[in-house]
Amino acid sequence: MPNSQAKKGLFQFYPHNLIWLGLSVLAIVLDQWTKWIASTHMNYADPVPVLPFLNWTLLHNYGAAFSFLSDAGGWQRYFFTSLAGLVSILFVFWLLRMPKKMVVLPVAIALILGGALGNLIDRITLGYVVDFIHVYYQNHHFPAFNIADSAITLGTILLLIDTFFLEKQRPKNSDA
């Protein structure tokens, strides 16, 4: 007799995965809070030294990562907004379908999702992304970034670790 409790199909999800959405929300809240602090307490493009290799520098990014396409004429705002929205929807479905025994992969997806939505909020409400973390060494400057970018980067690193090292150790059929 088939299990009537078995969840199948596109909208299958497991309640235990709501905790991962909580991690995404935490990333969004932390990102938006720090951007608000930077925007209300800093002057645009005026560096505030923190450490010998770190400044807080309020900047507006009209492009993608590292200001890619920031001077492309305006179409990139709609492109990146649409792309982030679509990827976020796919990530929510993927996240909610994670088997219970998995940890690294859902953390990775939750961080990427939270970072993408944090920057998406900026694009929709401001037309640009607020960046304020500026790391440098002598005359070598890394492009300014924010907490959302950090969440996306950490999530991507965890996703690569999961893909290349942990996936091989998982049983083929992991149940939730």
From Swiss-Prot:
Spans traversing the lipid bilayer: 10-30, 48-68, 78-98, 102-122, 141-161
Annotated Gene Ontology cellular component terms: plasma membrane
GO biological process terms, semicolon-separated: proteolysis
Magnesium listed as a keyword: no
Keywords per UniProt: Aspartyl protease, Cell inner membrane, Cell membrane, Hydrolase, Membrane, Protease, Transmembrane, Transmembrane helix
Keyword Cell inner membrane in annotation: yes
Location within or outside the cell: Cell inner membrane
The protein's enzyme class: hydrolase
Reaction(s) catalysed by this chain's protein: Release of signal peptides from bacterial membrane prolipoproteins. Hydrolyzes -Xaa-Yaa-Zaa-|-(S,diacylglyceryl)Cys-, in which Xaa is hydrophobic (preferably Leu), and Yaa (Ala or Ser) and Zaa (Gly or Ala) have small, neutral side chains
Single annotated GO MF: aspartic-type endopeptidase activity
Pathway, per record: Protein modification; lipoprotein biosynthesis (signal peptide cleavage)
List of catalytic residues: 131, 149
A Pfam family this chain is assigned to: Peptidase_A8
Membrane topology: Multi-pass membrane protein
Known EC number: 3.4.23.36
Family classification: Belongs to the peptidase A8 family.
Entry-linked HAMAP family: LspA (MF_00161)
PANTHER family the UniProt entry points to: LIPOPROTEIN SIGNAL PEPTIDASE
Role this protein plays: This protein specifically catalyzes the removal of signal peptides from prolipoproteins.
Protein name as catalogued: Lipoprotein signal peptidase
Organism expressing this protein natively: Acinetobacter baumannii (strain SDF)
Gene: lspA
